């Protein structure tokens, strides 16, 4: 006899499988199930007489049902998610798939695996990388602009190098100037000269006028006052003493040169250089009894150019006219060689 309880237990699994199967398969399944149920009801209605015949006809049907059930289970197994066929991923991980890149990286992210990254080893010195590593430029540039930029950068670099070289040359020149030859062929370094300010020089000169030699405590006090070292103050005083001593020794030499020069006011040099000539000099005569010898002896002309008895001076009567006719109370003709003389009354 056909087992109805086994059929009822099998129908829920078939119904669950039918929800996943396709519509055509569901239709075949329903027809087969309906046929089986109808056969079962018909066989139960016939009684025990038809039990043997129904069991013989149910064997092929069970085989077809089991084959259909195995087929549905195999298809259901293919739809179930497994670790090998399906991987659950989030939305950000699937974004690279839109651009044609694989979601899984092909290399390790461990920094210890690779060496240090040096951009200069892969790209040019002007900073322009490949298109696959950089974003497109918003302002496209031509090759000429790139060449100009590279030339300007090279020019700036060369200018900086030139400035550095010039500075180094100046430093070397200063060092060479600081070195001087002492005569033995060896270079001796000379210290650079220290320039004092006006205030420092004024204070040093003022102290030197009052005191030419300073003791060690006085040097230290003066150095602290004008912000110098005691050694600088000592050297300044030594140099200044030498300069003043040298200037004093030069002054007597100049005086000796002046004394050895010929005197321009001597009588002999004047007589030899200038011709003698008598010049009338106006003067006041108070006493009319003065003689010509006295006048000639006290004349400024004779004082300047020698004595009256000198052979260079001629006699007054040789070139002076007589003035006796012009002055009634004047002196004698011998003493009247002064034409512009005014006489006082006696």
Curated annotation (Swiss-Prot):
Residues 25-44, 147-156 have a biased composition (Polar residues). It comes from the Eukaryota. It holds the Pfam family Homeodomain. Residues 9-24, 49-67 have a biased composition (Low complexity). GO terms for biological process: cell differentiation; cell fate specification; gonad morphogenesis; nematode pharyngeal muscle development; positive regulation of transcription by RNA polymerase II; regulation of transcription by RNA polymerase II. Disulfide bonds: none annotated. PANTHER family: HOMEOBOX PROTEIN NKX, HOMEOBOX PROTEIN VND. Belongs to the NK-2 homeobox family. This is Homeobox protein ceh-22. The lineage of its organism: Eukaryota, Metazoa, Ecdysozoa, Nematoda, Chromadorea.
């Amino acid at each position: 006899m056909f087992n109805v309880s086994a059929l009822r237990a099998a129908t829920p699994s078939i119904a669950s499988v039918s929800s996943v199967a396709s519509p055509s398969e569901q239709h075949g399944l329903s027809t087969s199930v309906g046929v089986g149920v109808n056969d079962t009801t018909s066989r139960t209605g016939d009684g025990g007489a038809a039990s043997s015949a129904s069991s013989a006809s149910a064997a092929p049907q069970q085989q077809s049902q089991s084959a259909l059930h195995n087929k549905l289970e195999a298809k259901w197994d293919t739809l179930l998610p497994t670790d090998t066929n399906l991987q659950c991923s989030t939305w950000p991980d699937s974004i690279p798939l839109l651009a044609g890149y694989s979601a899984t990286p092909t290399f390790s992210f461990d920094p210890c695996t690779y060496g240090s990254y040096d951009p200069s080893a892969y790209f040019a010195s002007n900073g322009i990388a490949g298109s696959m590593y950089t974003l497109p430029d918003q302002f496209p540039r031509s090759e000429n602009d790139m060449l100009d930029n590279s030339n300007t950068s090279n020019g700036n670099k060369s200018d900086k190098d030139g400035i550095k070289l010039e500075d180094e040359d100046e430093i070397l020149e200063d060092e060479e100037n600081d070195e001087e030859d002492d005569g033995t062929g060896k270079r001796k370094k000379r210290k650079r000269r220290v320039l004092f300010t006006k205030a420092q020089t004024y204070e040093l000169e003022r102290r030197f006028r009052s005191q030419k030699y300073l003791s060690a405590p006085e040097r230290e006090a003066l150095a602290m006052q004008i912000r110098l070292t005691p050694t600088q103050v000592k050297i300044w005083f030594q140099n200044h003493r030498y300069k003043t001593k040298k200037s004093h020794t030069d002054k007597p030499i100049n005086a000796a040169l002046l004394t050895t020069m010929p005197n321009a006011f001597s009588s002999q040099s004047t007589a030899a250089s200038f011709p003698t000539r008598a010049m009338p000099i106006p003067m006041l005569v108070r006493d009319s009894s003065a003689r010509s010898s006295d006048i000639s002896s006290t004349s400024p002309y004779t004082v300047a150019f020698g004595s009256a008895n000198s052979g260079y001076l001629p006699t007054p009567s040789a070139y002076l006219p007589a003035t006796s006719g012009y002055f009634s109370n004047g002196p004698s003709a011998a003493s009247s060689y002064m034409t512009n003389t005014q006489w006082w009354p006696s």
